[in-house]
Regions:
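Non-catalytic, structured segments within soluble enzyme domains
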Residues: 1-120, 257-272, 276-281, 295
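Glycine-rich, acidic and aromatic/proline-enriched surface loops and short helix-turn segments
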Residues: 5-12, 35-37, 41-42, 99, ...
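A penicillin-recognizing enzyme superfamily signal
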Residues: 112-135, 147, 156-158, 163-174, ...
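Short active-site loop at a secondary-structure junction
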Residues: 136-141, 164-185, 193, 197-205, ...
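Conserved catalytic neighborhood of penicillin-recognizing serine enzymes
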Residues: 86, 92, 96-99, 149, ...
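Soluble, non-transmembrane domains of envelope/secretory-pathway proteins that act on or interact
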Residues: 72-90, 206, 210, 224, ...
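Acidic/histidine-enriched alpha-helical segments
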Residues: 54-57, 66-83, 138-146, 202-208, ...
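Soluble non-cytosolic domains of exported or imported proteins
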Residues: 10-14, 30-34, 48-55, 88, ...
Length: 543
């Protein structure tokens, strides 16, 4: 067998399989009787003339009692040996999956969960989009499809791109900057903690946050500001400033903890390392991690490991987020009208069946993402360049989203998808906004968080300010005074309304002047009104 696999035929064709594909354009298992005789007759002397090979094959046919006649064999020899051979490229359907299943060097027959037809479709959809984006400096892409109920991986296209400079990189496992794909989990955490509701008003206005080495000044994708918007609009339209304000409420520490609970092991630094830019996806994550996190949203907040080995045991799931918050986030991500504030009504995220989806674009357009789910499937797509080169004017909406839509439409060509129903502890209430801030609508709330009446943005809200400490203040403890006796006064201007002090996300009190026992480290102090809106925030340091 080893000899047959190593023997050279007619130049650079080595082995029975190679010569079979080169001469007959098929694998050895698919050869007919006359073709097999001819191939066997090449072994003694592959460089013989077609006539000599045909004579050997005819003698072999006679000895073996073959039905193939000498004339048939001679005609076949003249045809296949008288023309240049051509070996078509053999495209592996899922080489990265094969390497995963055979990891450790064990040679075995392994069954995987992939759907072969779907895998081929996903690869073709990616190749088609990458060909269209080639003129915009886009060479690489990856896509992952999983079953929500079982966690089985149905398609694993880890590296698509004919012009890829890194064809062996697994794009599904490679960490890349997350962009806006983390926002659903941030808002979900704020809703779960009852800091905010889907109808809470957030300011989409210029923001400066003291940070080490200067000020952190986030901007929106289009560098414009919408003013007061609801959380539903802020998430659907992927606004950056409201997301940063929400992280100031939740705290980076709590958000990092939540992301790790969702399986994002790529976040291996302390929360201080990421800071408030984490709201905008400054951290690196993998497509594998993102898809499973979105699958958790689709599964009502329950997380479990994905499965590729068909022979492996089913994974148990564990609750990592409030089921009610997951449902509210799913409702927002499926809201076509709310999304239109940034993307318009007609875009690649609009489907004729129920889906919830989010795009993301990293800094300088080095990566873009589209991750979303239906009732049955979760699909994630990444488009970019493995070396990290920027794309030219390609966002998640124009890069990854069309592939996501193609895959979802293929999955649901004969399968319906319905929105999740209400669960215990969640209520649906009509809401209206004063001054036509947003159109009236019916909104989901965790029971007990629904607003008592019309939602308004009060002018006096803008006047509330933190007077002390000022941004970037450095407070030094007095070594001559016992630490337990030292106090710092937080001073605020409340402008006639009730406000609450929060330090690093923890409630302190609601008096205009509040005494606090200082603790060494960096802190963020926020002033929040009775509707959980952030009126002001400052960062300071205690040494």
């Amino acid at each position: 067998e080893a000899y047959l696999n190593l023997i050279t035929f007619r130049g650079e064709l080595q082995g029975i399989a190679a010569v079979s594909r080169g001469l007959f354009d098929k694998d050895p298992s698919g050869l007919g009787e006359a073709e097999s005789l001819l191939l066997a007759s090449l072994i003694p002397s592959s460089r013989s003339t077609a006539e000599a090979v045909a004579r050997r094959a005819a003698r072999l046919a006679e000895r073996t009692g073959s039905a193939s006649g000498a004339e048939e064999i001679a005609a076949l020899a003249a045809e296949v040996l008288g023309r240049p051979y051509r070996v078509r490229p053999q495209v592996a359907l899922a080489p990265h999956v094969a390497r995963m299943l055979l990891a450790g060097g064990e040679v075995r027959r392994a069954q995987c969960t992939l759907d072969g037809e779907l895998q081929a479709f996903v690869q073709e959809a990616l190749n088609r989009q990458l060909a269209q984006l080639a003129e915009r400096n886009v060479r690489d892409g990856a896509a992952l499809v999983v079953d929500n109920a079982t966690g089985e991986i149905l398609a694993y296209a880890a590296n698509q791109g004919i012009t890829s400079s890194a064809p062996h990189v697994d794009g599904i496992r490679a960490p890349r900057q997350a962009g806006s794909t983390l926002k659903p989990f941030l808002y979900g955490l704020a809703i779960e903690k009852r800091f905010l509701t889907a109808a809470s008003i957030l300011e989409d206005a210029p923001l400066q946050i003291p940070a080490e080495g200067g000020l952190y000044v986030p901007e929106n994708y289009d560098r414009e500001f919408l003013g007061p918007v609801s959380l539903r609009t802020a998430l659907s339209a992927s606004l950056n400033i409201p997301a940063v304000r929400t992280l100031m409420l939740v705290t980076p520490e709590a958000f990092v903890e939540r992301l790790r609970a969702l399986g994002m092991e790529s976040l291996d630094r302390e929360a201080d390392y990421y800071g408030y830019s984490l709201a905008l996806g400054s951290a690196d994550v993998t497509l594998y991690e993102l898809v499973n996190a979105y699958r958790t949203l689709a599964s009502g907040g329950r997380w479990g490991r994905l499965k590729i080995d068909a022979g492996g045991a089913a994974e148990n799931t564990v609750p990592v987020m409030d089921r009610r918050a997951a449902l509210i986030v799913s409702s927002i991500l499926s809201d076509r009208e709310a999304r239109s504030a940034t993307f318009g009504l007609e875009n690649p995220l609009a489907t004729r069946y129920w889906t919830a989806v989010k795009t993301g674009t990293s800094k300088d357009m080095r990566d873009n993402w589209c991750v979303g789910y239906s009732e049955r499937y979760t699909v994630g797509v990444w488009v970019g360049n493995f070396p990290g080169e920027p794309m030219w004017n390609v966002s998640g909406m124009s890069g990854a989203a069309p592939v996501w839509l193609d895959i979802m439409n293929h999955l649901h060509r004969r399968t319906a998808s319905r929105a999740p129903g209400a669960v215990a502890g969640i209520v649906s209430r009509p809401v209206s906004f004063r001054d036509s801030l947003e159109p009236p609508r019916t909104e989901w709330f965790i029971e007990g968080t629904e607003p008592p009446g019309e939602i308004a943005v009060e002018k006096r809200h803008a006047a509330a300010r933190i007077l002390y400490p000022q941004p970037a203040t450095v407070i030094t403890l007095d070594p001559d005074i016992p630490a337990e006796l030292q106090r710092v006064s937080f001073v605020g201007r409340f402008a006639g309304d009730t406000h609450e002090w929060r330090l690093d996300g923890l409630a302190l009190g609601s008096s205009a002047v509040l005494a606090w026992k200082p603790e060494r480290g960096r802190h963020v102090l926020t002033l929040v009104d009775r509707d959980n809106r952030v009126a002001d925030a400052v960062g300071f340091v205690v040494k």
